[in-house]
Amino acid sequence: MRVILCLGETLEERQAGRTLDVVGAQLDGSLPASFPPGIKAKDALIVAYEPIWAIGTGLTPTNAEIAEVHGFLRARLIARFGEAGQDMRLLYGGSVKPSNAAEIFALTHVDGALVGGASLKAADFSRIVLALDAAPSRA
């Protein structure tokens, strides 16, 4: 079984400058101290940053904000799991659409996306998948 752990802040928490504190506490409170022998962290857990205020609203954090949170999460995973934390997948969710997917996938530490509403239209979803395939880290 592979778990997708979704982390995110409310609009009020973001406006108060608490995003990293909130997602850091969510991550720390949800992670095991270690994984059982024979189970690789990257195979057991995927972490997704999905700001609550962006879900279904059409609003998206800036690319700089997404990169900041993903860099923070990557550092936290490495601190917790060592090299295994580098290999764990980090996804972004929160109003991913064909018009912004390529820019989001080009960000460091963004390994994919949780796609909501855009997945309901085959053409839109296909464009998002193609954007992921073309992302620099996957070329």
Which ranges hold each PLM region?
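Active-site loop-to-helix "anion-binding N-cap" substructures in soluble metabolic enzymes
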Residues: 1-139
